[in-house]
C-alpha cells in the first residue's frame, strides 16, 4: 500500500521528464496524503497534459460518494476485472508525478516510517488510474488512484506491496487510450532491483499537517514507539437483575 509520497524537485525537472507543454509552478510537497490534490499526467486531445485531481478514486457510476469507500490504491492484480477499475484501466490511465514515497515497517510494537527514492535522485512516475464523477447538479470531481503490485527484493523487507513504477520509455504505452488494457497491464510489475534506496525517517511524517524537508531526512534514533492507547474506561457496575446484551454480530468486524 502507498499512502504517502513526495514531489520535491523543481517543476521544470518534471516537465522535461514527462513532456507536457504547461509550465506549472508548484511548491515542493513532502507529505502528500489521501484526499489531497495530486499532479497527474494524462492524454487529452492527442497530447499530454498535467492536471490536479483528488487522491482517492471515485468511479463515474457511484451515486453518492458518501457511500463509497476511499480508494487510494488499485491492486494491479485486479484492475482488469474489478468494477471500480475496469473502465479507467481501458481509457483513463495516467502517470502520477513523484520523487519519493513512504512505507512503514513493523519495529517492535510500533512502526518505523521509511522514505524510498531512486538512488540517482531522479523523479519517477507511478502508474495511475483516473476518473471523472458527475454529481446530480452537474458538478464534476476528478480523482485518481495509484496502481500497486508486490514489492521487489529491495523493498519487501519493509512492506509487501509497492507502487507500480512506469519506466520513462513506457510512458507513451501506458498513457495511450488506444492501447488495449491487457497490453498496458504488462507494465504492472515490481520495479527493477537496485533502482531504489530506503532509509528510516522521523515519525513526524505520520501527521498529515507536517510538510517540510525534515520529513525526508535520515533518522538514526531509536525505533518508533508503539502508538499510545487511551486507558479503557471503567465500566459502571450493572444492576444484578440486568441481563447481558445479546451478541449483535459486530464483534466479527474486529
What residues fall within each predicted segment?
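Short linear sequence motif anchored by a di-proline
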Residues: 1-254
